[in-house]
Design a protein with these regions (language model features):
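Gly/Pro-rich, tryptophan- and cysteine-flecked surface segments typical
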Residues: 25-220
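Sec-dependent, cleavable N-terminal signal peptides
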Residues: 1-30
Length: 220
């Protein structure tokens, strides 16, 4: 009977541990999903002059610290051939709103001089990392360190929410919320490395905001 009792308690303990582990993993995955947002853009720089707008807010609702801190919107703009064209970081204070013009801020300074008409925008909600020319948000994740390896110091942090308008083919303007997706380590590393790759060889090109070296200016 003693052995049977021990076995029973052991089984209960194992089940409880499994439940806790599952809950912990689920929470971590939810946190990662809530830090990565994606959307498309279409018909940029159209002859009618109808622009699209990206709006990003920092509600402070799910912030891991109190009082809630400012967060970086790390922005990566791709064309429809999966090539990164521009990247930038924008510091947004709690309850703050950033409004970015697609034509003027996000596709006007491609690293290769070819502005995309259609593509997608990826936004990582992250803690400030203060390495991009002395401003708080570095979308390259610190670039390459003295050891010759990528620093990769972006820390995804929950809270930012984003919306975007879209110019449809009939030139009607629609708006929707950015969709959340799970941010894998591989994707996060790739975004930082690709961003560093284009801004390090672009001589000012490849940075969002009409060539302004300080990308936080986009949001002021």
């Amino acid at each position: 009977m003693f052995r049977t009792g021990n076995s029973g308690w052991l089984a209960i303990a194992m089940i409880a541990a499994t439940c806790l582990l599952t809950a912990s993993v689920g929470w971590a995955q939810a946190q990662q999903r809530d830090t990565f947002q994606v959307n498309y853009f279409s018909n940029a720089n159209n002859k009618e002059g109808i622009d699209e707008t990206v709006r990003i807010i920092n509600p402070g609702a799910d912030a891991p610290t109190f009082p809630p801190s400012s967060l970086c919107a790390m922005i990566y703009v791709f064309d429809n051939e999966q090539e990164l064209k521009e990247c930038c970081g924008c510091l947004i204070s709690t309850d703050g709103l950033a409004e970015l013009s697609l034509d003027k801020n996000l596709v006007s300074n491609p690293f290769d001089g070819r502005s995309p008409t259609n593509g997608d925008i990826k936004i990582v909600s992250a803690a400030a990392n203060d390495n991009f020319g002395g401003v708080p948000c570095d979308p390259t994740g610190g670039g390459i360190g003295s050891n010759g390896k990528y620093v990769l110091n972006i820390v995804p942090t929950v809270d930012l929410r984003s919306w975007g308008t879209h110019v449809q083919n009939d030139r009607k303007l629609t708006e929707d919320e950015y969709q959340t997706a799970t941010l894998s380590t591989g994707e996060l590393d790739s975004l930082q490395e690709e961003c560093y790759g284009i801004v390090s060889v672009g001589s000012g090109a490849g940075i969002c905001g009409e060539g302004v070296g300080n990308s936080s200016t986009v949001c002021n």
